[in-house]
Amino acid sequence: METQAEQQELETLPTTKMAQTNPTPGSLGPWKITIYDQENFQGKRMEFTSSCPNVSERSFDNVRSLKVESGAWIGYEHTSFCGQQFILERGEYPRWDAWSGSNAYHIERLMSFRPICSANHKESKMTIFEKENFIGRQWEISDDYPSLQAMGWFNNEVGSMKIQSGAWVCYQYPGYRGYQYILECDHHGGDYKHWREWGSHAQTSQIQSIRRIQQ
């Protein structure tokens, strides 16, 4: 049972003017995530059903564990949805390495997060292109690929991508490891014409594994 104070906090969760960051009428939803300021689901806790651009505004100095109860979310290293991205699908994350362990980088900060409104695992489709601006060889994808090269893609880089439906997470290395880039059909109109549009942390066009995001 939630206390009256907790219920009031849930009613005053921060919102954002960005249409892509919060659930919209008719979207799949609902979304629900619970964050904790200590590892192993200890300490202060707070539930969210919409995006949070800065956990420090909710009196959290960091998120050290969390539970995703419904929907899919993106966690960010910094405030305002910037820095490293972490895919957060339904389940429990007792420590930072549960959401960034396969990242291959030691990042213990998670300061903002938002729901992924376009995730649709069964009907996801995207096209990857050899070069920027949708030029060169292309390949349509509608399944999970732990190794693009093993499945026929000719190198370890992708120049640009079009997301026709759903939401995807692309990884720097095979086996879903390395930097994570979450690409959605309702961001940029689904068009990512250059690797710099994959996220504020993007430093390379290297992509070697791709999978659909579970809703």
Curated annotation (Swiss-Prot):
Any GO BP: negative regulation of TOR signaling
Biased composition (Low complexity): 1-16
Family statement drawn from the similarity comment of this UniProt entry: Belongs to the beta/gamma-crystallin family.
Residue span of region Connecting peptide: 118-123
Functional summary from the UniProt entry: Crystallins are the dominant structural components of the vertebrate eye lens.
Entry-annotated residues carrying S-methylcysteine: 82, 117, 185
Location of S-glutathionyl cysteine modifications: 82, 117
Protein name listed in UniProt: Beta-crystallin A3
Pfam families with a match to the protein in the record: Crystall
MF-aspect GO terms: structural constituent of eye lens
Free-text domain note: Has a two-domain beta-structure, folded into four very similar Greek key motifs.
